[in-house]
């Protein structure tokens, strides 16, 4: 984990070690919708309760929200829920694995989603579980870090890559003021995000993400949560 100038908030990839001390996972879970949003519409008489519900949680950090989301959905979907949590930071993944309360249903892997070689572990998980797509892929508060490090086209590629593997795509974009704060903290530590000034998606980045998902990836927004204390909204696209 690259912490600059002894400031735990000055990180390049959003891999905060104490993230859930200032961003309550329990409060986030309260904003999640009920079962009807998570499940696809079924034909009369069709049921999938005997099948596990598979989730990929991208940017899972140390797994606190992953664990709470797993419990939340098992209680509401009334079926087995399987979650693969991935994060770029091996120390966060180690911590998540050590504190895993449901090792039969929840697993973790150190994966950079934009690294094709690293992403093979996700594809292997899909093959082992006979998945063409995940029932849901969740991206909680990570789009900014993809954007800052991989430019507009990198963020679009990230969204497209995950959209292709998801029945339901859950995105919680950070607003532009979060970018400005991240840039200030890194600059104060003596470094910068080299691509920051080149970004075209800026003050309306959350709307640009929605527009791209709807117009380019043919997604439809079916739910938007109330704002978190950081004024972020969790959006569900099918």
From Swiss-Prot:
Listed InterPro entries: Bin3-like (IPR039772), Bin3_C (IPR010675), BIN3_SAM-bd_dom (IPR024160), SAM-dependent_MTases_sf (IPR029063)
Domain of life of the source: Eukaryota
Coiled coil: none
Protein function: Probable RNA methyltransferase.
Keywords tagged on the record: Methyltransferase, S-adenosyl-L-methionine, Transferase
CDD domains from the UniProt entry: AdoMet_MTases
Family named by the database record: Belongs to the methyltransferase superfamily.
GO CC term (a single one): cytoplasm
GO MF terms held by the record: O-methyltransferase activity; RNA methyltransferase activity
Protein name: Probable RNA methyltransferase CG11342
GO BP: any one term: methylation
Keyword Chaperone in record: no
Domain Bin3-type SAM: start-end pairs: 1-238
EC number: 2.1.1.-
Keyword S-adenosyl-L-methionine appears in the UniProt entry: yes
């Amino acid at each position: 984990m690259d912490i600059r100038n002894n400031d735990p908030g000055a990180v390049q990839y959003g891999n905060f070690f104490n993230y859930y001390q200032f961003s309550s996972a329990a409060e986030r879970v309260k904003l999640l919708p009920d079962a009807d949003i998570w499940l696809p519409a079924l034909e009369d008489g069709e049921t999938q309760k005997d099948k596990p519900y598979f989730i990929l949680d991208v940017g899972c950090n140390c797994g606190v929200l992953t664990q709470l989301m797993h419990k939340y959905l098992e209680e509401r979907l009334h079926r087995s829920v399987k979650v693969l949590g991935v994060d770029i930071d091996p120390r966060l993944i180690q911590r998540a694995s050590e504190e895993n309360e449901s090792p039969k249903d929840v697993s973790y892997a150190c994966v950079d989603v934009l690294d094709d070689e690293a992403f093979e572990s996700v594809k292997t998980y899909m093959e082992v579980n006979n998945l063409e797509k995940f029932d849901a892929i969740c991206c909680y508060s990570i789009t900014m870090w993809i954007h800052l490090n991989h430019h507009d086209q990198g963020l679009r590629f990230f969204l497209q890559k995950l959209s292709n593997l998801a029945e339901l795509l859950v995105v919680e974009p950070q607003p532009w003021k979060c970018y400005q704060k991240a840039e200030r903290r890194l600059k104060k530590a003596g470094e910068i995000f080299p691509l920051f000034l080149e970004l075209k998606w800026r003050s309306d980045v959350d709307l640009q993400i929605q527009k791209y998902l709807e117009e380019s990836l043919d997604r439809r927004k079916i739910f938007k949560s109330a704002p978190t204390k950081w004024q972020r909204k969790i959006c569900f696209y099918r």
